[in-house]
Amino acid sequence: MADKKANDSFQMSIYEHLEELRQRSIESIVALLISMVVCSLNINILIELIKQPAIGIKFLQLSPGEYFFTSIKITLYLGIILSSPIIFYEIIIFIIPGLTKKERRLLIPILIASGCLFVAGLIFGYIYITPIAVRFFINYGKDMIEPIWSFKEYFDFIILSLFSTAISFQIPIFQILLGSLKIINSKMMLSVWRYVVVGSTIFSAIITPSTDPLIQLFLSVAVMFLYFSSILVLKLFKL
């Protein structure tokens, strides 16, 4: 049967499944640790890249160990991102035996697409969104006070900005999942496009606290492009 659980070559006992989980977990942790070591060996270069959007700002260490613990956070976050392809691969290999052929055809491409879109969102945020937001806060009130920032608070802001943009790039994944589960369809999504335009505009204004309408329009158009691209995918699959 086409929808039957994976064929005999994919069947596993409970013990084998637990052993597989242990092995995949170990390999994922090793990949993460190696990535963190690589990041820690290049921490000065990475910190310079993080500071790049805030050229001219003087950073302070406001408490003992602030820079040290922030450096650890940097190696952890970037280590996760760097090792994410291997971690995604381990997840996919682990879940395959428990999926039907139909579920495999749906879930595996979604996981791969989700990872690619997340990384694309991080890159988009670093190149376009974060620099604009940082410059806005630098220039706001600069005639009244001198901008001297805590490096920890700055890094937390950068992470929030990047991950907010990356999560917004997951919109197509949610749409395709909802469409595949028959919760909503492409016609329903298309019927509310006006509300989506307004929502994306508001979202862009929140994510980019800048008076520059061009960058807000840029992000809004990117979100709308992802939204309508997902509708097209659902239409192609008649969902």
From Swiss-Prot:
The molecular function terms in GO held by this entry are: proton motive force dependent protein transmembrane transporter activity
Out of the domains of life, which is the source?
Eukaryota
Q: According to its UniProt record, where is this protein mainly located?
A: plastid
Spans through the membrane: 30-50, 76-96, 107-127, 157-177, 188-208, 214-234
> What keywords appear on the UniProt entry?
Chloroplast, Membrane, Plastid, Transmembrane, Transmembrane helix
GO biological process entries: intracellular protein transmembrane transport; protein transport by the Tat complex
Write one Pfam family the protein is assigned to. TatC
Q: Where in the cell is it found?
A: Plastid, Chloroplast membrane
Which cellular components does GO assign to this protein?
chloroplast membrane; TAT protein transport complex
Q: How does it sit in the membrane?
A: Multi-pass membrane protein
| Similarity annotation | Belongs to the TatC family.
UniProt cross-references to HAMAP family, sorted A to Z: TatC
User: By what name is this protein known?
Assistant: Uncharacterized tatC-like protein ycf43
What gene is this protein translated from? ycf43
